[in-house]
Amino acid sequence: MRVLGIDPGIALTGYGIIESKNGSEFKVIDYGRIETSSSLKKSMRLLHLYTELCSIISLYQPDVVAIEELFFSKNSKTAITIGEARGVIILTCIQNNLSIYEYTPLQVKQSITGYGRADKTQIQKMVKSLLGLSEIPKPDDVADALAVAMCHILSSSSVLYQEDEV
């Protein structure tokens, strides 16, 4: 199974492509970020996100997409903007006939570290360790995208797994 993990954002969207044959061993295919300039109109930023994601999907041919669920408590403007980016991401995946699975930050933390209240540093160290990377992927959004992809692989291989496709 090849999973495209995504940590959505308008300024920066992290992505990571991971492959697993048995649900416990991981092979990193690629990871990186899609950046948009704040000097562009929002519509142009969303278009850039769309075209870059289309290229990534075309190049790496993932089987499924795992995306981090939106969680904000205070800044509604940020939540709306990220919601718009998520909409573009979900539409792009649907247009490419990809199944999409969402995971909360709590689910990702629990899956990767075994502790639902793990902090960013703990998650990043586990991502580095589990993927056999020489350094922690930067920026944080990229490490988060890899963590979401691993979360899907680990969750889907669990006997407790319940399919929760978007």
Curated annotation (Swiss-Prot):
Alphabetized Gene3D superfamilies for the sequence: Ribonuclease H-like superfamily/Ribonuclease H
GO molecular function annotation: crossover junction DNA endonuclease activity; DNA binding; magnesium ion binding
Compartments where located: Cytoplasm
Keywords assigned by UniProt, alphabetized: Cytoplasm, DNA damage, DNA recombination, DNA repair, DNA-binding, Endonuclease, Hydrolase, Magnesium, Metal-binding, Nuclease
Residues where Mg(2+) 2 binds: E68
Phylogenetic lineage: Bacteria, Bacillati, Bacillota, Bacillota incertae sedis, Caldicellulosiruptorales
Function: The RuvA-RuvB-RuvC complex processes Holliday junction (HJ) DNA during genetic recombination and DNA repair. Endonuclease that resolves HJ intermediates. Cleaves cruciform DNA by making single-stranded nicks across the HJ at symmetrical positions within the homologous arms, yielding a 5'-phosphate and a 3'-hydroxyl group; requires a central core of homology in the junction. The consensus cleavage sequence is 5'-(A/T)TT(C/G)-3'. Cleavage occurs on the 3'-side of the TT dinucleotide at the point of strand exchange.
Protein name: Crossover junction endodeoxyribonuclease RuvC
Gene Ontology terms: cellular component: cytoplasm; Holliday junction resolvase complex
Gene name per UniProt: ruvC
CDD domains: RuvC
Recorded family membership: Belongs to the RuvC family.
Annotated transmembrane regions: none
Cofactor: how and how many bound: Binds 2 Mg(2+) ion per subunit.
Protein EC: 3.1.21.10
